[in-house]
């Protein structure tokens, strides 16, 4: 779950933010939650952590940036790969060009480094 409307939570009331997250969950049924923009207020985190496992990332591909070349997107990710890293790629029209180039090459690099992709445990 990543909210329904991808709003910046720090600019929303707690109640409205929780409603948005729950609305998304009614559609996708996930016990995981990652806040948009990796930002969440302490009150939102406390409320959501009672119902969801909050997951943050530590490697941002920036694949959504149209000013970023696909090669630079790949470099943004591969220079930060390490055991336990959580990498963010986006599934959107805006990010498609960079993600299509960088994701398979990132997976190849992960294999070459002897790292493994794992499911986040609940």
Region spans (language model):
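Metal-dependent polysaccharide deacetylase catalytic core of the NodB/CE4 family, i.e.
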Residues: 1-72, 77, 81-94
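C-terminal domain-boundary segment and adjacent tail
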Residues: 97-122
């Amino acid at each position: 779950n990543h909210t329904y409307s991808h709003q910046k939570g720090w600019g929303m009331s707690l109640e409205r933010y929780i409603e948005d997250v729950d609305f998304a969950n009614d559609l996708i049924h996930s016990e995981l939650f990652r806040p948009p923009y990796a930002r969440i207020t302490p009150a939102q985190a406390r409320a959501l952590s009672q119902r969801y496992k909050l997951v943050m990332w530590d490697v941002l591909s920036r694949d959504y940036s149209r000013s970023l070349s696909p090669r630079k997107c790949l470099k943004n990710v591969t220079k930060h790969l390490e055991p336990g890293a959580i990498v963010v790629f986006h599934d959107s029209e805006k990010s498609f060009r960079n993600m299509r180039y960088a994701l398979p090459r990132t997976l190849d690099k992960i294999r070459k480094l002897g790292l493994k992709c794992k499911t986040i445990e609940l």
